[in-house]
Structure formats: structure tokens, C-alpha cells
């Protein structure tokens, strides 16, 4: 069920194509089926990082059962590599926030994931 919300000050020429490519990449990196991946991209030209408007980003990831300190290191490496290649944002110009709220705190299909998959 990963949802990824990207905010960047980089203008993306074809946002829809980027979102679809990002969705496939995120599914691979997070080892989750793409059918459960949700991507949101927001362009904010006023986003600053380290006091400048140079290319920057903020990424919030909410995902169940696969967020942990060891995996987050690899996720960070892979995702920042993707953003460097696709958006020109270096790895020192953004933050990635990893969050696993727990199955009871995420709703889907009129219930929660605890009810769907158990504890």
C-alpha cells in the first residue's frame, strides 16, 4: 500500500509520464505490487533547501510492513539516485520521510489493513 508524496521545486516537463515511471520504480524499490502504489507529485517553486532555490525535494513515504532502519538506507540510496537522474536533484538537497503507521491506522476498502490481513 505504499503512498509516496513528492514535493519539488523542479518543473517537470511531462508530469504524468514522470509519475508513471516513478510508480514503477517505487514498486520495484519497495518490493510492493504496483497495483497498491499511490504517487502524488506537487511542484512548489517556492520550496527552499539550505536557504536556496536550487533543485530540491521532499518525499514522504507511508508503507506497511517494510519500513525499517536497514531497508531505509537502501531505499534512500535508490530513490535519491532516481531523483538525481530524472530531476537533477542531488542527494544533499532533500529529505525522505519514512513512515509505517501500522495496519490498524491505514484505511482501505472501507476498513483497515488489520481487518484485511490480520495483525
Predicted regions and their residues:
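Interaction-mediating elements
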Residues: 1-119
Amino acid at each position: 500500500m505504499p503512498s509516496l508524496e513528492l514535493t519539488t521545486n523542479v518543473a517537470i516537463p511531462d508530469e504524468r509520464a514522470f509519475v508513471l515511471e516513478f510508480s514503477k520504480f517505487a514498486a520495484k524499490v519497495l518490493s510492493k505490487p504496483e497495483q497498491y502504489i499511490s504517487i502524488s507529485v506537487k511542484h512548489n517553486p517556492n520550496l527552499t533547501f539550505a536557504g536556496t532555490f536550487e533543485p530540491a525535494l521532499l518525499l514522504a513515504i507511508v508503507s506497511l510492513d517494510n519500513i525499517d532502519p536497514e531497508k531505509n538506507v537502501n531505499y534512500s540510496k535508490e530513490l535519491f539516485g532516481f531523483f538525481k537522474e530524472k530531476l537533477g536533484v542531488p542527494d544533499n538537497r532533500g529529505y525522505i520521510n519514512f513512515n509505517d503507521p501500522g495496519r490498524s491506522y491505514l484505511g482501505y476498502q472501507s476498513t483497515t489493513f488489520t481487518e484485511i490481513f490480520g495483525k
